Structures are given as structure tokens and as C-alpha cells.
Amino acid sequence: MVGFSQDTISKKKSQDVWQQVKEHVSIGGWVDAQYMYDKAGGVQSSVMQIRRARLDFKGSLSKWVDFRLQGDFAPNPRLIDAYVKVNFCQYVQLQVGQFKIPFSIENKYSPLDLELTENAQVISALSGYKDVTGISSYSNGREIGLMLTGTLASAKVRGEKIPILKYGVGLFGGNGINVKTDNMAKDISARIEFSPFVKNMIFSASGYWGKYNILYDGASTGVDGRRYRYAAGAEYNDKKWVVRGEYVAGLTDLASLNPSPDPDGLVVEPAFTQGFYVIAGYWFDFGWGKDIPMRQKLRPVLRFDYYRYNQHDAFNVPSIYYSAGLEWWPERHVRVQLNYTLKQRYQIDQFGHTLTAMVSVKF
């Protein structure tokens, strides 16, 4: 008889456990190293940083249940995604936890899939990235809550089944990520996407209706204000061409610039924020040569980006950004981006310039 030592048995058990983990969990992530030069109004800055350092766990607990846990370690450790998704059928899936809200088209995209290094101005301001409210927990376009999603209708186009009507609707705490809800009200967000029997083409409409605790000079006022958002747009993306445009608007109650020292005299005024953008890019796919099996991809991108912080304020003029960029994947784990933006803002004759270079390493 052949005997097995206790160490051999333990090693075999460890291998079996690891094999089961690999069958149900995928581990990935990426790191973004960025350099940015900015010049505006006579002021210059030159910044190098590790912008993101993501670690991402995805997996399935069963045929019907998926999960995701994603953290970011730059510039400070924080939880990005933490949710469980139950797939009842194609018409209904239930997602619970912290995740992206169903609002706008661009908000769906991971930074690794985004055409330029920065979101459009109005997406940042109204989709929960650098929110007009000034609340830092509105971050990464995410909230804590629950959401129903599904595909309500599909059709065959040139022999391939494509979704015609998709939806997402959720109930959220309304305070952003990694924080507890501090008000009785809950926020609602919804998005619907329609493909008009054209493969790779979608039309989208979405809304967000909520309240938040208004800040003044960085401190809570104890007063709840409206935080309403609306978006409509379209996108064509056939893995070669991408063309997308969206109009986004929002109504946000803000504390006035000169409130009375008496808290009872605090002046709250609505700000009507709006903007739109149009972006286009095309992928070139080519090899390194006959002796190198790897492929590389290159995408030039152009974007027009209009934004106005407060339409009700006659002194607040539009901010218009003209961006051009190159996105290069020398191989599937490495991305290099180079972006230039001409910024026309606040005064017609005042221009700013931003040059950004970013290297992403995916694992």
C-alpha cells in the first residue's frame, strides 16, 4: 500500500479549494499612472499621480446569483463596487449593494472603456462624479441601493438576436458611496434604452429624482434640497466606430452666496445646470509584424463639450471644451492615452489648455 503524509493530504485539499475558487471567482484590476499639465488664467500646474489602483473580484455563487467586490487604493483606499445580482430571467434581474446608478449612457462605462481620460463636464457635474452640490461622497457615478434591470424585447437583425428594449430602475439612499443615509427620503433613478432594429445603435432616456442635505461653505445646513437630473442621448458603437451624444440637465437647490447669519434666514435658490457633448472615435487594428504575434489598436478621438453651471445666473457664461485624443493599446494589457483640451470658459477671450498623458496596466 502506498501511504500519504499529512502534508500531502493538506496540499491536495488546498489545491482543490483553490480550483473551486478559480471556477467561481475572477480576480483582476488595473493601475492608472497620469501626468497632467494645465494652464488657465495665467496659472499653471504640473501634476503626476497614481490616479487609480483597482482590484476587482467578480464571480457567481450559483447559476442565478452573481457578485462583485471592487476597491480602489489610489489616492486613498475606498470601496467602489459591492453588490449581489440575482438573475431571475432576461426580463428581471435584481441588484443590491453599491454600484453605478442607471443614469446617462456614459456613466455605464468603466474608465478602461472611456474614450478620453476625463468624462464630459456635464456628466461629471450631474452623474455623481464631481457633483454640483459639492458633496464628495457623490463619487464614481455610484450609489447604495437596489435596482431592477432587464431586457423587455429582442429581435433578430441579420440573423443575430439583439435587445430592442432594455430598462433599469433603482431606489437609492441618495448620499453617495461608503456613507449611511441621513434623511428619510430615498432617491429614484431610471433609464430606458431603445434599439430601433439597428445593430449597435441605441437611444437612451434617463432621470434621477432625489433630495440631499444642502451644504454651505462645506458645512451642513440641515435643510433638504432638490437634486433632479434628466438625460437623453444616442450612441452608435460597432467596435470600430463609436459616435455618442447626450444632453443632460439638472435642477439643484443650493445655498445662496450671501445667506443671513441667522440659520432661519438661509436663502436657498435653484440652480439649473445643463450641457451636452458629442464624441467620435475610430479603432485601427494592426499587427507588429510577421514575427510578432501580438496585435495593437489605435483610436483617434474628438469631442465637443458644452456646459453651463447655472442657467439662471446671467453672470455664469458657458464653459466649452474642445478635446482631441489618441488611445493606443500596444497589447491587450497596456493602454497609453494622450489628450489635449482647449478650454473656453467664463470669458469669451479666456482660454485654458490641458495636456494629459496616462498609462494603464491591466491585469
Task: Label each PLM-derived region with a short phrase.
Residues 41-42, 68, 98, 200-363:
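Outer-membrane beta-barrel pore domains
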Residues 1-11:
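Cleavable N-terminal export/targeting peptides
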Residues 17-177, 184-189, 193-202, 277-283, ...:
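Outer membrane beta-barrel
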Residues 3, 150, 168-170, 325, ...:
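Small side chains
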Residues 7, 120-121, 246:
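Residue-level marker of intrinsically disordered, low-complexity segments enriched
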Residues 161, 181-184, 316, 349-351:
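Short glycine/proline-enriched turns and hinge-like loops at secondary-structure junctions
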